[in-house]
Amino acid sequence: MAFNMHNRNLLSLMHHSTRELRYLLDLSRDLKRAKYTGTEQQHLKRKNIALIFEKTSTRTRCAFEVAAYDQGANVTYIDPNSSQIGHKESMKDTARVLGRMYDAIEYRGFKQEIVEELAKFAGVPVFNGLTDEYHPTQMLADVLTMREHSDKPLHDISYAYLGDARNNMGNSLLLIGAKLGMDVRIAAPKALWPHDEFVAQCKKFAEESGAKLTLTEDPKEAVKGVDFVHTDVWVSMGEPVEAWGERIKELLPYQVNMEIMKATGNPRAKFMHCLPAFHNSETKVGKQIAEQYPNLANGIEVTEDVFESPYNIAFEQAENRMHTIKAILVSTLADI
């Protein structure tokens, strides 16, 4: 079946087929090679892209900006403090204004409904840079990174996610693995598993792709034999620091430490994290937590010894944000 990525939204990956996802991964690989070899051609000259950030960002903003600049496009960074979004103007009205000026819009913020509304009224492609429910651009980077660090075909790669699985990373890792036929293990307290309706949707995709989906409360069982171990921060952006106490109590058994990495039984296993990570007490938040919980001074969701070890490929994963976002922009906006 033929497909056309031109002028497509990227909101959750829910509506992208396996073939389309594989195409984006292959294009990401090709664009990365072209950048490394100095043979990249610009396909987005005279294109203008708006970047709306209601949540702060390092990797997503830099990845979109560099990807666009490499391809000859212009970007405008918009945050709530420097615009009328949410103050004097609704997202619906913002969409109808920006859609007349820009060729595409990226949104990073809170509820999925907001980016869906933006896509409904903008009239141009909209890309989800992160919402509370999904992180689709991160997923493409994660799978590209796993493919680069494994000599197995995608359907033979296994990975585990440990931690709060109700968030955008838990949801998205389950979804993309289900779409691509991978072996996905989610380890979390049952109260922090993805919602039942979402899991049911992913199981339907898994039936079509041959994916294996496992949800368990046992972290060591989850990581047994896996190729990659993923985690994320235990409190998401926007949640108060006061929420840490109960979450730490719930999630401490799911901390990625050397014991967990060795429990994989796979000497080639790698550690992945979408970043930023609280792996020591050198950040403001890390210091706050260490003062309250001295046993976490050497890492919260991941320990310092794992993060600074050869297990860690999170920085290559971060670089791949730019290559995969570039593939999204080119496949959607380029006149080729």
From Swiss-Prot:
This is Ornithine carbamoyltransferase, catabolic. Its EC number is 2.1.3.3. It is found in: Cytoplasm. PANTHER family: ORNITHINE CARBAMOYLTRANSFERASE, ORNITHINE CARBAMOYLTRANSFERASE, MITOCHONDRIAL. Proceeds by an ordered sequential mechanism with CP identified as the initial reactant. HAMAP family: OTCase (MF_01109). It comes from Pseudomonas aeruginosa (strain ATCC 15692 / DSM 22644 / CIP 104116 / JCM 14847 / LMG 12228 / 1C / PRS 101 / PAO1). InterPro entries: Asp/Orn_carbamoyltranf_P-bd, Asp/Orn_carbamoylTrfase, Asp/Orn_carbamoylTrfase_sf, Asp_carbamoyltransf_Asp/Orn-bd, Orn/put_carbamltrans, OTCase_ArgI. The gene is arcB. Keywords: Arginine metabolism, Cytoplasm, Transferase.
